[in-house]
Amino acid sequence: MTQQIRQQPSPVTNSNLYPRLRKHFVMLLTYAILTIIAALFVIPFMWLVITSLKPLNQVFTDPPRWIPDPILWQNYVEALTSPAFPFLRLLRNTLFYAGVSTVGIVLSSALVAYGFARLEFSGRDVLFGITLATMMLPGIVTLIPTYVLFRWFGWVGTYAPLMVPHFLGGAFNIFLLRQFMLTIPWELSDAARVDGAGELIIFWRIMLPLIKPALLVVAVFHFMFAWNDFLGPLIYLDEATEYPLVLGLYAFQTRFGIQWHLLMAATLSVTFPLIVLFFVAQRYFIEGVTLSGLKG
């Protein structure tokens, strides 16, 4: 006869229960705080979408209407075909200078970062420290001298001030790419040098393919900055035919008064490409930001 031995469950004591309850409480509190913070960011965007679908007489109703009645998709057609907001021309201008400046800052920052990360020369660390120190200087401080310089060059009224400076790199982008390059094994560069490759060949054929996630981070950061830049185009561009999308929105709301439902539709149309860009590049974006901080 076989004897069955039952294993009695150990009683749950207060000493075991308290840490579990505390862990669940902390987790619940964390999610509650994160939900509130997320709502602070999501609700304005939701209001933007809702307002873009309302008729004008429902924009400022009290209490506010969260569901438009009727839903007017026609607002987008009116906004994007309005003479005050020539969307296709504004989009073309924005893509031109934002795209060119993005290519310039990615290549120049990567080249400078390669020098700081992979080359040994006298004063390298001092120069890198000076480069980082430039991030401490607010851009508004240099606004007037920069404008005077660009006017002396004859660049005011052209896209040059919005593109050419970015071909000289940027301190934050250089730092980000340098940190990523420090994670690349030195053996790859040494093997290429043994085979007779020069530094430019190593940079172009070995280093750039290996740092694609970080390059994408720099490209996305700068493209979003250039897309949303308001002050630069406002200062340096004179003709309305050269305006980007953000200045088009500004002219849209001041030329015929503020028609909020159409302005919100135009604003969402301007914002939507950046949202799509971020979600498409999200995986590489997070990878680049994470790996760039592995080694200092």
Each language-model region and where it sits:
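A structural signal for multi-pass alpha-helical bundles of membrane permease subunits
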Residues: 8, 18, 27-296
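Short, Lys/Arg-rich, polar N-terminal cytosolic tail immediately upstream
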Residues: 1-21
